[in-house]
């Protein structure tokens, strides 16, 4: 055996050892949970988009657009008589919404989405005038203004016909709002950090507590319920941030997801979890197709006979039944076997939904069946 062959075998052995030792499905805490209180907040506002190329609101059908414009002009020192209602096509009333990210500070920009409220055909080319964005408490947290970016296209004729591509009545303004008010500091005055799992799972909570205690010392973390883990932390904000920086990178293997089958009855979409099993069962699958065709028969009387032309309908009904097939599931059948068996009999997605519902009703499906 030469030296190069020995080196290759040694390298292969070491790589194999590394594969065995490395955690199979370790995930970071930051991917499994979020810090309690650290979240975004919804903002909403109302405003006007101007500068549209004739694609704005039809003000005869949206009087609030004219009212908003008159109020705006009044604030700018332009008085419009109360009995004058300008018929404009380059203005649109819009709703504005955005998310105020955690720890946002005054002066920072955030993205906003602008949506038409009335009957504007398109917001392309428009500019949003300054509008306040309020939170759920009624306080103004940001001011929005800017030029819209619209991905769709729309046009409408005088006869009411219209052509549109995508959704031209919704646009975005990157960095279109400036934060004016900061949220209260969620890091002040508590001696614990709360971690909330994205999915309820007692096994994951238990493993998270064990992983944190292993990294920071026994008694650092405690389980509160199937979602929440409380971690002891210093009260100093700087020290808490340092702790969180280390804490969110702790790795653990989460618990297995529960066996579940999710069915969308409207679209025929079926999602089957990896741990779904089927108890022993036999299924027969077949289909019956009924075709109804209508033919019109006209009976024309002879000349000078005094008869009348008769029109009759002739219906032809044909029923065909494709060969029904039966397949059997043994105990502990896995996801791959279920899909393979159903595909072999040529079942459509709608048929698969019916088969899964029947299996659940018969007690042969060892999983939760959720229909959405």
UniProtKB/Swiss-Prot annotation:
One of its GO terms (cellular component) is outer membrane-bounded periplasmic space. Assembles around the rod to form the L-ring and probably protects the motor/basal body from shearing forces during rotation. Its main location: periplasm. Belongs to the FlgI family. InterPro entries: Flag_FlgI. It is found in: Periplasm; Bacterial flagellum basal body. One of its GO terms (molecular function) is structural molecule activity. GO terms for biological process: bacterial-type flagellum-dependent cell motility. Residues 1-26 form the signal peptide. Disulfide bonds: none annotated. HAMAP family: FlgI (MF_00416). This is Flagellar P-ring protein. The gene is flgI. The keyword Signal applies. The basal body constitutes a major portion of the flagellar organelle and consists of four rings (L,P,S, and M) mounted on a central rod. Transmembrane segments: none annotated. Keywords: Bacterial flagellum, Periplasm, Signal.
């Amino acid at each position: 055996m030469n030296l190069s062959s020995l080196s290759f075998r040694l390298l292969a052995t070491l790589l194999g050892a590394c594969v065995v030792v490395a955690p199979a499905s370790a995930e970071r805490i930051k991917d499994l949970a979020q810090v309690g209180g650290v979240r975004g907040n919804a903002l909403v506002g109302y405003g006007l988009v101007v500068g549209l190329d004739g694609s704005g609101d039809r003000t005869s059908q949206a009087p609030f657009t004219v009212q908003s414009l008159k109020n705006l002009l009044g604030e700018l020192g332009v008085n419009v008589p109360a009995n004058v209602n300008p018929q404009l096509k380059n203005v649109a009333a819009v709703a504005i919404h955005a998310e105020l990210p955690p720890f946002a500070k005054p002066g920072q920009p955030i993205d906003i989405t602008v949506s038409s409220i009335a009957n504007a055909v398109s917001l392309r080319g428009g500019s949003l005038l300054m509008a306040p964005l309020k939170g759920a408490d009624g306080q103004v947290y940001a001011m929005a203004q800017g030029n819209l970016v619209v991905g769709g296209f729309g046009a409408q004729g005088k006869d009411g016909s219209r052509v549109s591509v995508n959704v031209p009545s919704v646009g975005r303004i990157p960095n279109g709002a400036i934060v004016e008010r900061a949220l209260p500091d969620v890091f002040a005055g508590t001696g614990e950090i709360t971690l909330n799992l994205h999915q309820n799972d007692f096994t994951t909570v238990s493993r998270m507590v064990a992983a944190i205690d292993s990294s920071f010392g026994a008694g650092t973390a405690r389980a509160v319920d199937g979602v929440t883990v409380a971690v002891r932390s210093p009260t100093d904000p700087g020290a808490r941030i340092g702790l969180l920086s280390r804490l969110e990178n702790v790795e653990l293997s989460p618990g297995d997801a529960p066996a579940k089958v999710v069915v969308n009855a409207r679209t025929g979409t079926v999602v089957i979890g990896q741990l779904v099993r089927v108890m022993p069962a036999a299924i027969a699958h077949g289909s019956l197709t009924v075709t109804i065709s209508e033919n019109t028969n006209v009976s024309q009387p002879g000349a000078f006979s005094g008869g009348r032309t008769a029109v009759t309908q002739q219906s032809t009904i044909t029923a065909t039944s494709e060969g029904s097939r039966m397949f059997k599931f043994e105990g502990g059948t896995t996801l791959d076997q279920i899909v393979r068996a159903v595909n072999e009999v040529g079942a459509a997605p709608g048929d698969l939904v019916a088969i899964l519902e029947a299996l659940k009703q018969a007690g042969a499906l060892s999983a939760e069946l959720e229909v959405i």
